[in-house]
Amino acid sequence: MSDRMAKFKAGMPKEVIDAMKQEFKDNYDTNKDGTVSCAELAKLMDCPEEEAQRIITGVDVNCDGRMQFDEFLLYMEGYTKERLYSSDEIKQMFDDLDKDGNGRISPDELSKGVGEISTKLVEGMANKLIQEADKDGDGHVNMEEFVDTLVAKLPLCFKKCFHEDFDKNGDGSLTNAEMSQLLNRNLPGQYSEELINEMISRVDLNGDGRVQFGEFLMHAQNLSKDDIKNQFMAIDKDKNGKI
């Protein structure tokens, strides 16, 4: 076991490890061979096999091309590190609101403290973004660092968007009707049936007449880099190329 793995497991309660082991068996290791293959992970995450392979390669300590349970823990460790605030930080925010220290937050305490907490949240988010994205260590984030950092987080954002906002019947794909409903709700009268069909055919890589999440993800990521650059320029008020 690697030092990194030993340290990670040592800091986890046994109940948590047991729960993650059950999650691994029930939802990841679908053929019950004790490992997760690229195909299994791609199916579970509804993503291209290339993306699944990239994830496995990042934690494949024994280089067998599959994800063992200990490697799965490393994968989950990466997700844990992506959380914006730790449990200790959240507890501190609660304590800051709980002025009389009785373990509960009253409406008056919430009203008085929310402005202060909101300021801390915004400052904390900004500081964490700078720390994570500032690859050259100059204390600022340039456009390349900004784009690289946010693009790395896009798949999870797009997955949430796809399933919650687009795929209304929950079948894992977008039909012509779902696309039409979505576009006409947000941009009424701007998209004809013919144009929607053309949009689907451009994204529909497997030719089944529907948009799967993997197809949606590949297309959305291509579009999003320009959007992220535009956001960077909007934030960069003094136009010096850094935030």
From Swiss-Prot:
Organism: Lytechinus pictus (Painted sea urchin)
PANTHER family: PROTEIN PHOSPATASE 3 REGULATORY SUBUNIT B ALPHA ISOFORM TYPE 1
Pfam families registered for this protein in UniProt: EF-hand_7
Binding site for Ca(2+) 5: 167, 169, 171, 173, 178
Tissue distribution: Aboral ectoderm, a squamous epithelium covering the surface of the late stage embryo and larva.
Keywords: Calcium, Metal-binding, Repeat
PROSITE patterns reported for this sequence: EF_HAND_1 (PS00018), EF_HAND_2 (PS50222)
Function: Calcium-binding protein involved in larval development and metamorphosis. Likely to function as calcium buffers mediating the transport of calcium from the sea water to the blastocoel where calcium is required for skeleton formation.
Binding-site positions, Ca(2+) 2: 60, 62, 64, 66, 71
Positions contributing to Ca(2+) 1 binding: 29, 31, 33, 35, 40
Highest rank taxon of the organism: Eukaryota
Name of protein: Calcium-binding protein LPS1-beta
UniProt cross-references to InterPro entries, sorted A to Z: EF-hand-dom_pair (IPR011992), EF_Hand_1_Ca_BS (IPR018247), EF_hand_dom (IPR002048)
Sequence positions that bind Ca(2+) 3: 98, 100, 102, 104, 109
Entry binding sites for Ca(2+) 6: 204, 206, 208, 210, 215
